[in-house]
Amino acid sequence: MADYDLAILGGGPGGYVAAIRGAQLGLKTCIIEKDKLGGICLNWGCIPTKALLKNAEVYNTIKNAHKYGIKVDKISVDFPANIKRSRDVSNRLSKGIEFLMKKNKITHIYGMGKLTSKTTIETKSSKKKEKVNAKKIIIATGTRPRSFPGMEI
């Protein structure tokens, strides 16, 4: 069983910022996340969406270039390249967070975490199970929208 002063369950913006701050305060810190660091917004929601919107904005600017006396003969959209760019943007930012974890000597444990006591988290990944003991635990798992009967999302 690994021992830490602080364990963070969840690698989104709440979790990774808390982990960095804990490490800055001198705490032996780990962060438990099943996926890439950064959370839903960075990896699958806000950031990739904004990258795709920027692609659309650039397309629209080129499409209207004639209004500025610029002639463009042919314009087309390469959808796979657009998706690749949005993934590349997200991956670059997530790797930046990984760098900050290493720089601050924070252990990133890949897997799902389950509280088994007030100081113990059992982690499970496709490769292994382990227990983490921590004096303090922060739950920063984010949220999902709740569906109500008759109002499914």
Model-derived segments and spans:
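N-terminal Rossmann-fold NAD(P) dinucleotide-binding loop
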Residues: 15
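Glycine-rich flavin
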Residues: 2-4, 20-27, 32-152
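Beta1/beta-strand and adjacent pyrophosphate-binding region of the FAD-binding site
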Residues: 1-12
